Amino acid sequence: MTLQEEITRWRTFAVIAHPDAGKTTLTEKLLLFGGAIHVAGAVKSNKIKKGATSDFMEIERQRGISVATSVMGFEYQGRKINILDTPGHEDFAEDTYRTLTAVDSVIIVIDGAKGVESQTRKLMDVCRMRQTPVIVFVNKLDRPCKDPFDLLDEIEKELRIRVRPLSFPISSGDTFKGVYNIYEKNLTLFTSDERQTADASTVEINDLASPELDEYISERYAKQLREDTELVEGVYDAFDRDAYLRAELAPVFFGSAVNNFGVKELLECFIRIAPSPRPAPTETRIVEPAEEKMTGFVFKIHANMDPNHRDRIAFLKICSGTFERNKNFLHVRSGKQMKFSSPTAFMAEKKSIIDFAYPGDIVGLHDTGNFKIGDTFTEGEKLKFTGIPSFAPEQFRYIENADPLKFKQLAKGIDQLMDEGVAQLFTSSLNGRKIIGTVGALQFEVIEYRLAHEYNAACRWEPISIYKACWIESDNAEQLADFKRRKHTNMAIDKHGRDVFLADTSYALALAQENFKDIRFYFTSEF
């Protein structure tokens, strides 16, 4: 198979949502219908019945939320699919934002009862900025939901994108009958299947005028469906794939992931319309997937995916060419040649060694501590891929060693967890104390839990009053030195040795910006 043929087979996408919209459940069902798993780990009302395949960290299984991005690959109808299931909890949005740099399209899950929520808007802003094609899945139709047309209006208004429904629900809640597939012009009726298997019984009706429809869903609902689909065709433009690929139009599907409604239709339409790997921007040029030479970048690092083996995996997105096992590649940041004897493909925590990987694929590289998020690998060209964000943390605490005998374990744990990008480490210039900065409070809990369970280290937190952390730099060396001297008590360095100003109030920050005109203050820093 040629490189171009391999490229056209790949579909790499992320599933994103506001917490509790049913994102991990939908991911499970896509894997189920794709044949990658045979029974989904039903995740209901935040209680884990069976651990969801994609929630592979112990704390995720306990709490019923996703706090790290996991990668799952499978083959379906001749296509190679990579799904990235992202954290829904807003405290872990940073991991989600970074994941969006590694995907070619996105499925946004919306709770049909709640509509568009705050986290959904923020995620859509990132998709819009990156011009990432978006499909919307309106979930939980088995519960009472907003009117479908009201939901479509809300999506257009709140997410600022034109929509086109490609499926349509028949009622919702207790009277939910199923979903009409507008794209394929057929109706598939599912029964609620608590066994959660993919072979749920279906009834197909290819003609809405057929009297069979009245028999299956009653005359009342059949009449309503005919009117609704007529209205859809009258109100919304015909589906335009090019507009979807330009991120100007969002196809919308309706269903209930937990009951298997509408998931198969979503998957089958997705593999037909979603983009294959797209060009990737670097600081110097655009990299095209069909280029002969391999390029790729690390968008995530995860320590202890298997606590028994203390392994650390760097997730590499292949952007062009062919990645080969045991072939030398340039690690651009260090300038060193490296080869990998056991690169892996993923099915959540299940990993298998691969010999080749192609654009769109995500490869796991064993990492002994050499890699950072944003690192680029090439066959010799010095490239740096752009747009992998790091956000200014909003919550801060001192981290202290709670067990003097475990100093080394704590230091190693902090070092590795910060490399993953779960939080940021600052060392105070005043007293050398370590400060952890996070986007949300739950991250402190996760760090403490993982230090205890993965590194056998104990930490305790102490409060510190910081309003904002901002990275500073200046072409005026004299003013920079003067600033650092005057603000010594508020200065720190980050893990990479960069200067950071820890402003204790918004007034102090505004005053610093006013008095030191030659200094640039950054609230985000790309890795």
Predicted features and spans:
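Structural and coupling elements of P-loop NTPases
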Residues: 1-527
